[in-house]
Amino acid sequence: GSVIGAANNKQTIYASASAQGAGSATQNLNLSVADSTIYSDILALSESENSVGTTTNVNMNVARSYWEGNAYTFNSGDKAGSNLDINLSDSSVWKGKVSGAGDANVSLQNGSVWNVTGSSTVDALAVKDSTVNITKATVNTGTFVSQNGTLIVDASSENTLDISGKASGDLRVYSAGSLDLINEQTAFISTGKDSTLKATGTTEGGLYQYDLTQGADGNFYFVKNTHKASNASSVIQAMAAAPANVANLQADTLSARQDAVRLSENDKGGVWIQYFGGKQKHTTAGNASYDLDVNGVMLGGDTRFITEDGSWLAGVAMSSAKGDMTTMQSKGDTEGYSFHAYLSRQYNNGIFIDTAAQFGHYSNTADVRLMNGGGTIKADFNTNGFGAMVKGGYTWKDGNGLFIQPYAKLSALTLEGVDYQLNGVDVHSDSYNSVLGEAGTRVGYDFAVGNATVKPYLNLAALNEFSDGNKVRLGDESVNASIDGAAFRVGAGVQADITKNMGAYASLDYTKGDDIENPLQGVVGINVTW
């Protein structure tokens, strides 16, 4: 539990062998430190004159301790030799470098760490269940042996592990994620002839992840994997797409109100309120996968006009929604406030047409958590969205309560482009567009329960997102954040006229496609008419 030296006043522990006349001289120094804190440099010094051989051997054993200091070897004379062996064990930590003309060997065991502070040269480096951190400097070694070892590098620098001789064993390589692009030409581990080292690792830079790959020359490089998005890439893509996801869910919620009025025998318009929410899973064209958990409330009022050939329904609504987003190690949220206007036309022959328009304002925030301890970066921006929807269909009834309602719907949405920064790096998102088509059929049955009328139904639909080319850019790289393609939706719901002046409705849907899955999406509403 002792402290040797001080952080601002390091001591130097050294061994020296010198000889001038005939014969030779040898000096051995064995240092063993346990459960201590050491602020000291180590020096192995050997001096010879008149071709007299001198040898200095220093053996430094550190266990369960923190050591801050450098290790040096120094030879003076053609017959001088200095040897330095450093052995760290049992979760010891060393902060320092190795330099000099003599021989130096470093061994780390049982959870020990060497934080290299300057360019270091050793003859042999052995790592067992321990870590070498070369983020600050390069290490040159003659041989390298690793058993469950860890190498920490800075992939945005050119600090490397250079092995001139044989390298063997297994090694995990970590580099903290960053927003900087990685030089794929830098060999972060170079090996000598007949090496059998197996090294693996993944990091991220800019929009993509980089996998540690062994080249044809036997050296190891970080190579960009364009099929794996980085945390920063996933977040900026999700933040571009999430407001569109929320806006489309709000459009579905408003459509549920229009459907409920059409199914009701008593609803002549009035005041209504709906809760809506759902769990969504999306994957963009740029390989960003994210989950979105949305909850919201919509409040509206409308009136129904009866005509000779049917009816009109006109109304307005406002909604508030929040979507909690998670992607990779990062998270964020989207808050939206929207205003809606809608108009429905119902004909006595069963044909109906629904239209709606919306304007929304969306606030987006996120915490980008870079992999491998790269830190957390905050991002935020606001945007506005404009959307419209048209739906047409036909209601067939058999006169005994059964009804079938085929329909087709097309909705379009555009979000304003935005510019913001991630830790000083420019991010640009183009206008984000969504053009969503849907065709389906609703099958239900109408029956009475006491004084109430209940209409349960099943719904089956096919959807397709047509919009593509929604680009986002981080620095000098860009990626497609679109979620296009087909999906299928199956759901069930019920509409009930509880009294002459009150109704209620609810629906629950499941949607699945190649790039989308909504395992749960629902609406619950109540309306009062007069």
Which residues are covered by each model-predicted region?
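Repeated loop/turn-to-beta-strand initiation elements of outer-membrane beta-barrel proteins
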Residues: 38, 67, 94, 307-314, ...
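Extracellular beta-solenoid/beta-roll
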Residues: 39, 51-223
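Outer-membrane beta-barrel pore domains and translocons
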Residues: 74, 276-278, 317-323, 346, ...
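Transmembrane beta-barrel domains of outer membrane proteins
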Residues: 164, 261-263, 293, 300-306, ...
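Outer membrane beta-barrel translocator domains of Type V secretion systems
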Residues: 226-400, 509, 514
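Solvent-exposed, glycine/polar-rich loop segments of beta-barrel outer-membrane systems
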Residues: 235, 239, 285-292, 328-335, ...
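Transmembrane beta-strands of outer-membrane beta-barrel proteins
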Residues: 271-273, 312-316, 341, 351-357, ...
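Outer membrane beta-barrel transmembrane domains
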Residues: 398, 414, 423-530
